[in-house]
C-alpha cells in the first residue's frame, strides 16, 4: 500500500502537484489521470478555488476536497480526479510517505471507473500503478509522450513505427522501455534516410 511505486510517486512529481502547506489530491489526480492513465479531462465550466481556511482544520484533505467537489457539475470529472488523487494521500506536500494525518489514519482506497466503464477498487499508489499497467490507454499515451519527448514530433509522423504494435508489446512485456526508447530514437534519426551500400 505504501512506498514508492512508479513515476507517480516520485517526490518531485508529488511536490510539484501540492500546495505549499498541504497535499493536493486534485492537482495530483489531474496529473495522474492525464499523464499516467492517458485519460481526457475537459476544463471545468466554473473554476472554484480551494481555500484551506474555509474548512474545519481537523478535516483531512480528502474530506475537504470531497466537500468542495460535491456538486453534480463538478463530479462529472472529479469522479476520476478524486479517485486517482486520493490514492496518493499517503504522501505529504513534499512527497514523504505518511500513514496518518495528525492522529487520523489516512484512507487511500477509492472506487475508480476505468476507461471501459468498469468500477474498480484502487488501494493506494500500488493499486493505481497496477491499474495503469493493465490499461492499454496508459501504454499508448506513454509511447506518444515518449516519442514527442525524444523525436519532438508525434509518433504518427514516422511511417515505420507501428504505434498499436508497440503499445501491445509494451503492455504484454515483450518490449522493455529501454528498447522502446532506442527504437523511437533510431527511427527519428533515420526516417527517410537512404543508406548507400
Residue ranges and their predicted role:
Residues 1-150, 156-197:
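Active-site substrate-binding loop specific to GH73 endo-beta-N-acetylglucosaminidase modules
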Amino acid at each position: 500500500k505504501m512506498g514508492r511505486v512508479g513515476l507517480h510517486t516520485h517526490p518531485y512529481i508529488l511536490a510539484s502537484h501540492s500546495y505549499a502547506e498541504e497535499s493536493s489530491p486534485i492537482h495530483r489526480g489531474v496529473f495522474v489521470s492525464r499523464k499516467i492513465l492517458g485519460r481526457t479531462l475537459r476544463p471545468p465550466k466554473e473554476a472554484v478555488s480551494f481555500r484551506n481556511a474555509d474548512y474545519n482544520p481537523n478535516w483531512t484533505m480528502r474530506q475537504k476536497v470531497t466537500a468542495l467537489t460535491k456538486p453534480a457539475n463538478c463530479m462529472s470529472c472529479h469522479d476520476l480526479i478524486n479517485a486517482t488523487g486520493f490514492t496518493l494521500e499517503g504522501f505529504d506536500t513534499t512527497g514523504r510517505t505518511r500513514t496518518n494525518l495528525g492522529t487520523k489514519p489516512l484512507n487511500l482506497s477509492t472506487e475508480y471507473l476505468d476507461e471501459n466503464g468498469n468500477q474498480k477498487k484502487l488501494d493506494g499508489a500500488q493499486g493505481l500503478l497496477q491499474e495503469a499497467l493493465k490499461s492499454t490507454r496508459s501504454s499508448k499515451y506513454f509511447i506518444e509522450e515518449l516519442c514527442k519527448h525524444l523525436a519532438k514530433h508525434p509518433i504518427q509522423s514516422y511511417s515505420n513505427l507501428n504505434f498499436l504494435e508497440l503499445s501491445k508489446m509494451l503492455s504484454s512485456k515483450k518490449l522493455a522501455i529501454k528498447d522502446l526508447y532506442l527504437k523511437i530514437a533510431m527511427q527519428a534519426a533515420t526516417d527517410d534516410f537512404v543508406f548507400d551500400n
